[in-house]
Amino acid sequence: EQGYPFVMKFDKSGKVTIAGNNSVSTGGVYKEESSTYDFVQDMSVVLTFDTYNEIFHEFSSPQTDGVGHGGDYEFQMKGMSADKDTIYVMGKKSGIDMRLVRFPMGAQYTDAAGATETVGSWADYFKAIEANTARLFNNKISGYALSSGDETFDVDGLGVGVMALTPVGLSEIEAASRTYYRGIIVNLDNTIRLSSPFK
């Protein structure tokens, strides 16, 4: 499954406001909701979102398959960048490395029409991510390839958030068993992050 960005504001009293714009928990529209958070000790410091937040907890709620989206609501604190703009965490259940990045207020991006826009609100941030995704992964580009060591992979699915990597030159049967899938998330700086390392 693809990665989903959230915007969060933590206050000192334990309240967190979370915003999202995705098909899973917000119906494809921008929404905000407040709940609470805490830091607990569990073999390390853990950030826990300890009251239900519809926008965020939908990803960690089990569905009829017993798994749902496989998301987390508790995160082991792993460290901080030297400039203190990024906090590195790991999902306690999933083991996926994630980042909490300082909100990029004032950052510029190019919208779908090619105009330069500025991130002035949380809603603008989601518009910027959508514009970057549309610009990076559109039907004008015939295909993508990735080289890793001495192997080349055809890359597909970037526009829908799940990257499929298939080694070049395989038969259809071989490709079915050797295609690797990784969820991705598009960043404001036109980079993408994989949900797990590709080796």
Regions found by a protein language model. Name each.
Residues 1-32, 40-199:
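Lipid interaction determinants
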Residues 37:
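TRNA-recognition modules of translation machinery and tRNA-sensing kinases, especially anticodon-binding
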